[in-house]
């Protein structure tokens, strides 16, 4: 299996690797998951391409299986957790300290998820010279101001996915999420720092469209914004 994976990596066959990554994650084969992600990385695949063409596609494959009732919610959750762990490992190659003098804070809107989108954002920003703090699920807004000042943050990145398990875009929570986004923008404007919003979840929030300047769907988009 590993030999086949290395062959696909050398051919840059992203489509098949995404399928294999989805399958391996669903049977909890961490060895194959790590081989695909680390193998592509070591082979010189740009981080943004690795995320856009392999990791995100694998996530979509798993999500489609969930929508079609081929797998359970728990399967999808475990799949994403395994992939997230492997992706997070890429942060070790760019520890904080190798930076361009700028500090970034990454936040997501979920309390209970291993949010792969925010982890991929952190990896990409570190590989582009940022010193990154990942606070995971949304910090209290009062806290947000003090963290920004204390850590000398230049840019804040919020990530909101639209996966079935994402509670932040469930109807009951939408107004809360929208309020959090508006409040975050106010904090950023007051402190004169850049704010980025990523993920397809934003497109489910009608009130927000057109009111946020810097949004990204792909990691190649994010790369251009930073």
State where each predicted segment sits.
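A structural preference for short, hydrophobic beta-strand core positions in alpha/beta folds
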Residues: 134-135, 197
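Conserved hydrophobic helix-helix packing surfaces used for dimerization/oligomerization
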Residues: 102-105, 156
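Short acidic loop-to-helix transition motifs that present clustered carboxylates
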Residues: 137-143
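Short acidic-hydrophobic, aromatic-tinged amphipathic segments that line or gate anion-handling sites
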Residues: 213-222
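Long amphipathic alpha-helical segments
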Residues: 1-95
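Cofactor-cradling patches in redox/metallo enzymes
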Residues: 144-208
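Short helix-loop-beta junction
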Residues: 119-133
């Amino acid at each position: 299996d590993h030999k086949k994976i290395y062959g696909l990596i050398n051919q840059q066959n992203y489509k098949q690797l995404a399928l294999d990554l989805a399958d391996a994650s669903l049977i909890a084969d961490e060895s194959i998951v790590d081989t695909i992600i680390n193998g592509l990385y070591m082979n010189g695949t740009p981080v943004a391409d690795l995320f856009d063409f392999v990791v995100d596609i694998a996530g979509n494959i798993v999500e489609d299986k969930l929508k079609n009732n081929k797998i359970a919610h728990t399967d999808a959750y475990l799949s994403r957790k395994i992939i997230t762990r492997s992706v997070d490992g890429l942060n070790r190659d760019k520890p904080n300290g190798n930076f361009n003098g700028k500090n970034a804070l990454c936040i997501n809107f979920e309390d209970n998820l291993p949010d792969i989108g925010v982890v991929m954002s952190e990896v990409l920003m570190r590989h582009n010279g940022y010193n990154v703090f990942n606070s995971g699920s949304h910090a209290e807004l009062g806290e947000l101001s003090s963290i920004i000042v204390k850590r000398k943050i230049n840019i804040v990145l919020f990530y909101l996915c639209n996966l079935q398990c994402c509670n932040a875009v469930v109807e009951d929570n939408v107004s809360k999420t929208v309020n959090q986004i508006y409040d975050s923008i106010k904090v950023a404007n007051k402190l004169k720092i850049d704010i980025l919003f990523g993920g397809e979840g934003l497109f489910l929030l009608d009130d927000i469209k057109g009111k946020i300047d810097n949004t990204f769907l792909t990691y190649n988009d994010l790369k251009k914004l930073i």
